[in-house]
Amino acid sequence: MKLILRADVENLGSLGDVVDVKPGYGRNFLLPQGLAMVASQANLKVFEQERKKLQAHMDALRAEAQDMQARLEALDVVITMHVGDNDKLYGSVTTTIIGDAIAALGVDVDRRRILMDAPIRTLGEHPVRVRLHPSVIALVPVKVVSDHQSFEEEPAPEAPAEEAEAAE
């Protein structure tokens, strides 16, 4: 089945490409989603008239994704997890946890856009990819820390402050 793509489709092509796909993929996904139209002489003429409008829309989406990429890459995402002996995590850091941590910093990202080969199971800093657009992928630094570290670090600054008040 020959189709004209009306948008960039991952692993298939970009706006304006004439592609040959299996009939089921075209009928059940691309056509109902408005991502493609049947490649006929009449549709080619119609598409050429729509091309500039569609291209402007795609460029606007790409620019918005690049702005979001800059905001995401500037974030310091810290996830506190419970650990056991030898700094081994109880459970793992999944896309849902990362998505919630990013949302807590004020940027909403759909967890399905977070790309991970496997859940994070170790402490430390891990780069996590977020697909914002077919051509824009942000690398977000995610730091996984122990919940024991955060409790140990907090009381230390309070002790000198209490001593200073007692000295007065």
Curated annotation (Swiss-Prot):
GO BP terms, alphabetized: translation
An example Gene Ontology CC term for this record: ribosome
Keywords, sorted A to Z: Ribonucleoprotein, Ribosomal protein, RNA-binding, rRNA-binding
InterPro entries assigned to the protein according to its UniProt record, in alphabetical order: Ribosomal_bL9, Ribosomal_bL9/RNase_H1_N, Ribosomal_bL9_bac/chp, Ribosomal_bL9_C, Ribosomal_bL9_C_sf, Ribosomal_bL9_N, Ribosomal_bL9_N_sf
Region span, Disordered: 149-168
One example GO MF annotation: rRNA binding
Compositional bias segments (type: Acidic residues): 152-168
Family matches, as Gene3D superfamilies: Ribosomal protein L9, C-terminal domain, Ribosomal protein L9, N-terminal domain
Keyword Phosphoprotein: no
Keyword rRNA-binding: yes
Pfam families noted in UniProt: Ribosomal_L9_C, Ribosomal_L9_N
Family: Belongs to the bacterial ribosomal protein bL9 family.
PANTHER family: 50S RIBOSOMAL PROTEIN L9
Function: Binds to the 23S rRNA.
Protein name: Large ribosomal subunit protein bL9
Name of the gene encoding the protein in the UniProt record: rplI
